Amino acid sequence: MTTVYYDETVKEDALKGKKIAVVGYGSQGHAHAQNLKDNGYDVVIGIRPGNSFDKAKKDGFDVYPVDEAVKQADVVMVLLPDEIQGKVYEEEIAPNLEAGNALAFAHGFNIHFDVIQPPEDVDVFLVAPKGPGHLVRRTFTEGSSVPALFGVEQDASGNAFNLALSYAKGIGATKAGVIETTFKEETETDLFGEQAVLCGGVTRLIQSGFETLVEAGYQPELAYFEVLHEMKLIVDLMYEGGMETMRYSISNTAEYGDYVSGPRVITDDVKQNMKAVLEDIQNGKFANSFIEDNKNGFKEFYKLREEAQDHQIQEVGKELREMMPFVENKTIEK
């Protein structure tokens, strides 16, 4: 049975009187730090000099190199990209942790796959908002919140559970509700969702649909509209009310096609492939591949990225988006 915690069920403020170092000031970092600060907590930022360092200072924070921020803190929230966390932890965080400190993460990758192995005398917990940082911040300022997951990997103090819940409340997540999980469950489900559905699955489905239409002689521009551009319309409907709302909102022709043709595309063989992807996540094969490629300068990663950018759908999309001024208000600035 899933357990969900809300504002009123967080009885103890285990963060009270503690200094929090947020390491990193990117998408999640700025949201966590600003929400915690607005809720009255003592927050410092740990980050290397650069644009994010300057932005954090401009936003009114005391900003330090990572090692100096960690030295001051009781709770250290690590919000850096997965591939650099291990190095930063080893060089700048670990030497400055003290017994009784707490080490926190918004994604369990490096703890679950033993890239980071904290000492036994610190708490280790997870608070993972289920939305990007800009949404975590925006909903907070509007008086609502994004739901989150939380969990405890190591309870050295005997109070790590309350500390994790208090942190979740501190960033505003308990307004919407937070679900208890484990580092293992959060990491494996998150990676699977990204690889099999949200990123890997969807992009391959779209590309294959685009190629099928173009190879059959249809205009690439029409193919783009039908298999990529309109994806947002369908996803928005599912986001708002699940598959039921989506199917209620489309034509009977589209709904009938959904039922009779969907299973021809996503066959039982595809599900077996999904299970193989999940197995590679569970047994560490994917993590080891990612970690090794990172050590080798991401040679395979960059090669795959370049190949993906060379696909015809990229150029067609770029041209068509110039016809759509309504997409000028971008969520992400490159």
From Swiss-Prot:
Record GO cellular component, one term: cytosol
Biological-process GO terms, alphabetical: isoleucine biosynthetic process; L-valine biosynthetic process
Location of the active site: 107
Keyword Lyase: no
Reactions accelerated catalytically: (2R)-2,3-dihydroxy-3-methylbutanoate + NADP(+) = (2S)-2-acetolactate + NADPH + H(+); (2R,3R)-2,3-dihydroxy-3-methylpentanoate + NADP(+) = (S)-2-ethyl-2-hydroxy-3-oxobutanoate + NADPH + H(+)
Domain KARI N-terminal Rossmann, residue spans: 1-181
Cofactor note: Binds 2 magnesium ions per subunit.
One MF term in the entry's GO annotations: NADP binding
E.C. designation(s): 1.1.1.86
Binding sites annotated in the UniProt record for Mg(2+) 2: 190, 226, 230
Residues holding substrate: 251
Pfam assignment, any one: KARI_C
Top-level taxon of the source organism: Bacteria
Annotated keywords: Amino-acid biosynthesis, Branched-chain amino acid biosynthesis, Magnesium, Metal-binding, NADP, Oxidoreductase
Known pathway: Amino-acid biosynthesis; L-isoleucine biosynthesis; L-isoleucine from 2-oxobutanoate: step 2/4; Amino-acid biosynthesis; L-valine biosynthesis; L-valine from pyruvate: step 2/4
Domain KARI C-terminal knotted stretches: 182-327
EC class of the enzyme, as a word: oxidoreductase
Positions of NADP(+) binding: 25-28, 48, 52, 82-85, 133
Metal-binding keyword on record: yes
HAMAP family: IlvC (MF_00435)
Role of this protein: Involved in the biosynthesis of branched-chain amino acids (BCAA). Catalyzes an alkyl-migration followed by a ketol-acid reduction of (S)-2-acetolactate (S2AL) to yield (R)-2,3-dihydroxy-isovalerate. In the isomerase reaction, S2AL is rearranged via a Mg-dependent methyl migration to produce 3-hydroxy-3-methyl-2-ketobutyrate (HMKB). In the reductase reaction, this 2-ketoacid undergoes a metal-dependent reduction by NADPH to yield (R)-2,3-dihydroxy-isovalerate.
Similarity comment: Belongs to the ketol-acid reductoisomerase family.
Name of the protein described by the UniProt record: Ketol-acid reductoisomerase (NADP(+))
Gene: ilvC
